[in-house]
Amino acid sequence: DPMRYTQLLPGIQTCSEYDSGIHIQGCDNSHNFVGIEGVPVYNASHLLGLFSTFNASHFQSMDISKNPFKASHPNRIGGILEMRLHDNIHTNVNGGLEIGPLSSQGTLHSPLGKNSSITLSARSAYLNLLYGSMLKIDGSSLKYGFSDYNFTFQSRFKKNTRLILNAYYGNDNSSMEEEHNSDGIRLKWGNALVSATLRHDFSNVSSISHSIYYTGYRNRLQWKVTDISMSLPSRIQSVGYKSGWKQRFLNIGIEGALHFIEPQTPNTSTDNTATDVTFRAQEHTF
C-alpha cells in the first residue's frame, strides 16, 4: 500500500495502525496534498483508513515532498504525496492479480495499435461474503464493502507529443441495520476523478504540458428510527486547468481551479413531513 509505505519514512507519522492518513513534519493529514499527476484526491482512504485509495499496481512511482515551499507546489501547508502514471507506451499484454483475505485487485496493460496503450485496474473487498455472519453488534448486522477502478489511456501522435487520459472511481458502503426492522445507519462515500493531459517534449530537458481535470468527493450519512429518517450529505467538486513549461531547472506555469463545496445538507422526514436545509459555497483559486 503506497500510503502505508510512506509511514515508514523519517518525518512522517500516523495516529494508529487503523489510519491511512499521514502526518508530515507534524502537520495534520488534511493539510497534505494527495493526488494523481497533479490532480487532488480528497479523503484518500477505504475502510475508515485501513486501506488507501491507490491501487499500487496501476502506477509507476510515487513522489513525496516534505517541504512544499516551491511556487509550483499546491496550496497546502503540509507535504505532498503524488502518484505517477507509467510514461511508456505498452507494447505487449501483461498484468497481475492479487488475492488477499480482505480484498483482491487486478491490473491489465495492453497495447492499442502501434502508438497507443491502455491500463485498467480494479479492486474490491468481500468482507460481507466471508465474514458477514461474524460482523454483528448488539444484534445489529454490520456490513461494509468498497471498490475502486482506474483507467489510463496513452497515445503518441508524433514522436514527442502524447495525450494521456486518466480516470478513477472509488466507492465505499457501510451500514448497521436491525435484524427485525428497518432501523439502522448507512454511510456512503467515494471519489471520482477525470483528467486529460497533452504533453510535448522539445528535448530531454525541455517540455510543455496542458491539463484539464475534474475531481470530486461525496459523503452521505443516513439513519432511520421508527418513522423518522435523517440524512447528512456533503460534497466537494473541483474543476481546473493547468499549463507548464520546463527548461532544465526553470519551471513556468499557470493553474486555475473552481471549487464547489457543500459542507452539509441536513434532511429530515417523517411519514407526513420533510425538511431540507442547504448550505453551499464556491471558491476560486489561481
Kindly label every feature range from the protein language model.
Residues 1, 19, 49, 59, ...:
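Transmembrane beta-barrel architecture of outer-membrane proteins
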Residues 33, 61-72, 78-86, 93-140, ...:
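Predominantly transmembrane beta-strands of Gram-negative outer membrane beta-barrel pores used
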Residues 1-69, 80, 86:
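Periplasmic N-terminal accessory/gating domains of Gram-negative outer-membrane beta-barrel systems
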Residues 29, 39-41, 86, 102, ...:
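Structural signature of outer-membrane beta-barrel domains
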Residues 31, 57, 90-92, 113-117, ...:
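Strand-connecting loop/turn motifs
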